[in-house]
C-alpha cells in the first residue's frame, strides 16, 4: 500500500505539477532514504511505460564506472540522458552503478535545471542535509549540550588571554599608567607634524614661484605701454628721453631681486636633515649671484650713459633732415608756377615719419643663450629706387636698425675712428644757414633742369 501511495505522489509531481523530480528532491520531500527514492523512481518509469507505451517521460541516469585515459585508470561519474546511456556505458571499462537520477516531462537541454532543483531542496534542509544520505562516518558523532557549552567557555577564555598578556607586558611608570600611553602616542604626532610641516613648506614654495613669475610679467607689461607712450614725446626734447631711461633702469634691479628671492627658497625645501653640512656652501651661492647682478647693473648704467650721449646727436640729425625736406618742397612750389596735369599726378616721395618713429624707439636688448646681450643700432643707409614717371634714379638716406651683440659694440669702440667723408666735414664746420643755402641752390638747379626739359617736350608737341 505504501508503495502505491508513493507512486501516486510521483505521478502527481510529474504530470500535474510538471516538476523535475530528482532522487534527492524526492528523498527530502517524502522523508525516505536516497536509495529508496532511486528505487521508487525506477519502479515508476517501468510501470508507466508498461501501462502506456506512448507516455512522454524523459529520464536521466547517474552512471559510474572506471575509465582508462592515456594508460591511466580513473573513476568517472556522469549524469546522461537516456538516449546517450548506451554510448556512455561503452566508453567505461567497467560499470559500477546505474541509477535513475531524475524524471521530467520536458526534454532537458543542459544540467542547469537539475542543479537548481537539488540546490533549492538542500538549502531548505541545510541543518539536516545528510539525514537521508547513504554515506556514513562512525567518528562523526554529534556533541551533547554539555560538551557544546564547555567548548564555548574555552573559546572565550582563549580570546581573553592575549589581552591579559598585553596588559602585563606594559607595567606602569612611577605608578602612572596613562602617561606611558600618552608618551607612546606623542612620537607619531611629532612625525606626522614633521610631514605636515614639509608639505606646508612645499605648498608655500609652490605658491611663491607662480607669484614671482607673475610679478616680472606684470612689470614688463606695464613698462611696454609707458615706453610706447613716451616715444611720441621724444620729438619735444631730450628731457623726455632722460625720463624714459630713468624709469626703465630702476625697474631692472627690482626684477633681479625678485629672481634672487625666488631662487633661494626654491633650494631650501630640497635640503634635508641628512645634508646639514652642505648649507654653508649653499649660502655662498646667493652671494655670488648678487655680486654678478651688481656688476651687470654697473655695465647697464655705463651703456645707458653712452646711449644718452649718442642720442642727442641723432636727434639733431633727424631734425635737420626734416627741415631739409620742408625746404625742398617750398623750392618746388616757387619753381613750378604753372603745374600741368602730369605733374599733379606724379607720386609724392614716400613719407619718412614711420622711419623716424622707428629711429626714436629705444634699442631693445635680448639676452642670448651664451650670456651675451643683443642690441639694436641705428645706421644711416642710402636707398635707391626708380621713379617710373620721371624715368630717373632717386636716392634717399634712411636710418635703419641693425642687431649686434655687446662684444661687437665693444670691438667697434676699440677701433680707431674712421676717416670722415669729404662731404661730412663742411657739415660740421659751416653754419646751418650756409648749408641750407647750398642745398637749396643745388635742389633748385636740378629741379629747374628737369622741369625745363619736360616743358620743352610739351611745347614741341
From Swiss-Prot:
Protein name: DNA polymerase delta subunit 3
Motif window: PIP-box: 451-458
Gene: POLD3
Region (Disordered): 148-229, 249-380, 399-461
Assembly information from the UniProt record: Component of both the DNA polymerase delta and DNA polymerase zeta complexes. The tetrameric DNA polymerase delta complex (Pol-delta4), which consists of POLD1/p125, POLD2/p50, POLD3/p66/p68 and POLD4/p12, with POLD1 bearing DNA polymerase and 3' to 5' proofreading exonuclease activities.
Matching PANTHER family: DNA POLYMERASE DELTA SUBUNIT 3 (PTHR17598:SF13)
Low complexity compositional bias, start-end: 215-228
Any one Gene Ontology cellular component term annotated for this protein: cytoplasm
Localization per Swiss-Prot or TrEMBL: Cytoplasm; Nucleus
Pfam family, one: CDC27
UniProt keyword Electron transport, yes or no: no
